[in-house]
Amino acid sequence: LLNNDVKDAVMEITMTGPKMVFNVSTYLSITGADMSPTLNDNPINNYEVIKVQEGDILQFGKLKTGFRTYLAVKGGFRTAVKLGSRSFYKPITSLNCLKDGMEIEISEFQLFEPKITQMKSQSLHHFDEIIAYRGPEFSMLNKESVKKLKSQRFIVAKENNRMAYQFIETIEEHNYEMLTSATLPGTVQLTPSGKLIILMSDGQTTGGYPRILQLTKRGIAVLAQKRSGDSIAFKISN
């Protein structure tokens, strides 16, 4: 929508959105969860290019659908670059989120002719089926555990963040032992008590629990829009 570079930083907003005053003119676009955004108290839509003037106030209201919203401005947010990234991640960066009253640098754009001014919603909140592939230790599962994974719905527990998601439901307990091995975003680990832990974008890179499933990139994106109490089902692909 904004023709930004893939490395230009966006703002991820979880559950509750901020109130922002723009000190320069620019263009913005909002995707992901619908948090009832307004510009100068006038409702605006997700998945559109919005012209912003100096002094305009952007505010987010009630969360209608989804869990995470993404706000982009033309040219991206100019946060400090650490290890080739503008993301916040303690302890590599001093902050892990924005604080009230902070100022964030953006570039001024008076003129911009977008190739498209709006697009069909790409929101994933209404999907509840998550595609996953068999993980390296999938074969250690017994028939009952496999049956539960394929047929049971799993409710997102309160323990969920950018590092990992957990579910209320469990599968069979096990005593499988393995060496610490590599993990990726989307790796589904199984604890000895039968609890499933799905590593997310800021998840650890190694782990000692069996890696029974691996989510697709789309599966990770779908799960990231789920909040506590939402449910999902796995579709296990060969």
Language-model-detected regions and their locations in the chain:
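Conserved "landmark" site that anchors the functional core of diverse proteins
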Residues: 1-238
